[in-house]
Amino acid sequence: MLPTPDVSHLTSKDFNHVYEPAEDTFILLDALEADAKQLVDYRPFICLEIGKQIFCSISTLHFCTDINPLALRASAFTFTQNGLPQPNLIQTSLVECLRLGKMIELLIFNPPYVETEDEEYADARGDLTISASWAGGSDGMKLTNQLLDKLDCILHPQRGILYLVAVKENKPDEIIKRMVDSGFKAVVVLKRRAGREHLHVLRISRPSAHAVMCN
């Protein structure tokens, strides 16, 4: 269902400006593959991928957002290269330009999760450099916190599901507690060590969606 995307059309010059698929990409693909049967049966109507994309194509309406216009351009070519229908590609941060409040049923986010100085995080996002794909500010959570703060207003009230990549430094257990305290169900669906990184994929969902995914 979710093969590793073919990016052979992209060159080393492209990867000076666009994030190259790496272990965080692959663990997210594997987590979605593990849930593939439930997701296909679930038939999400609206899917949104934010930032580093895995080129998922299991929804009727598919949106991708990124602050980097070169990343969106590369994504358009990659969808074509892999024989996938073109999504709606939108240059924005998170969901700022979208009017899809409480409509997103499947949200996929591989954020910039590396702990950096907040100044480096701000500079990377302001300059739209490649480091914006990994520089995460304090605890590597600056952008993730912005999304989680808005999650109740983003996800569909019954069917909303978020797949989120995190590393140990992001304190996944604290993310889970925070989201459970906010009325969501949250679990680690996959974790893996890749070099110095301890990667996790969290599934954060509305209670009714969680029940379906656990069947």
Region roles according to the model:
Residues 1-215:
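Auxiliary N-terminal substrate/complex-recognition segments of SAM-dependent methyltransferases
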